């Protein structure tokens, strides 16, 4: 039988999808990308912000139509939306057969069996259980890079965020298990490991009594075949001197950090439940750039948080201008039910949020272009992603670019290159967020 898997949301969700795909493949199920030939459809959902929730619901409704028409034998919904609205999904969309919570992915085979037998049920596990069964993942990212989810859940409880309710408390995956998983990925041809979690920098504190991300990274550096290790979702206040030292000493560790700071006004930061002040953020950024001069820093911001004044928005704009982050994304605030921020007074109109978002991104575009122009003439190591269709050109990424969120470099060459190859490239031109180069 053929299964179509629709994976929505973040890279952490994608890891969950790959785990379930591995379990299904071990049973002999065949995967397909064509909904018209699928016997079973599984939708791994997201509900982090309003748009993600809407996308998940729309996908469920579209696939439910196929089930209603008799084209699909079973429809299963998993992920954050399933955990949060499990009963409502079954009540309001009767075409859905099974709903799996975020810690019940090891029961995907049971869910498929039950769905094919005509059962309709919710399958849950303890919200604070370690959700990922030890199984061989079916990597879906092309084979040359893969995400390594090092922890689940979050203890921060930011006032705008629903994640602790749908993912549980923070719990680290044991280091030995992660090293074994990374070794298996390397044996499959993976060359870049991208460490992800709701927060990576707190890794190990629950298991080992101290933050141990630096120890994990050193252990991963010893795996043959791994060329790059990239770290995402670092909380600024949790970055340790030991982690900085590992980044300086280990050549496999990309000089790249993703630091979601969300805002720069102290009042807004406090209302968000964040644990840093503006000055502390400045100090952390300056320290990282002093210790690792070629580091690439990515951040994300939220604009239009309840009570954000025009003056506080201008302060954020000034902060972005002064800090000159290499990479930056901006979300408009999305009120999520059952979060403290959703009930706060002075909610901002959507039009104002979007205008402020556009202003920040216009400023960041100028910063990004200036930084891209500064790269012209430099020689860089590039991981090849693939060939540009119908052209003698390839596209790749430098250490400064995480897949799917950052820029690319376009390389003109007649040589034959493969995805996952590394090549030395001279930068010859700059676009808004991307580079142009020639093979050396």
Predicted regions and their residues:
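Proteins enriched for Cys/Gly/acidic motifs involved in redox and nucleic-acid/cofactor modification
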Residues: 1-203, 242, 253, 257, ...
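Conserved beta-strand core positions
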Residues: 3, 40-41, 146, 193, ...
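Short strand-connecting beta-turns/loops that link adjacent beta-strands
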Residues: 36-37, 155, 252, 264, ...
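Short glycine-enriched, charge-decorated loop/helix-capping segments at active-site entrances
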Residues: 47-48, 167-168, 207-210, 270-276, ...
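Conserved SAM/AdoMet-binding glycine-rich loop
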Residues: 75-77, 84, 187-311, 321
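Conserved, mostly hydrophobic/aromatic
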Residues: 178, 195, 231, 259, ...
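Active-site proximal loops enriched in glycine and acidic residues that flank catalytic Cys/His/Asp
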Residues: 197, 233, 261-263, 299-303, ...
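Terminal RNA-binding accessory module
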Residues: 343-440
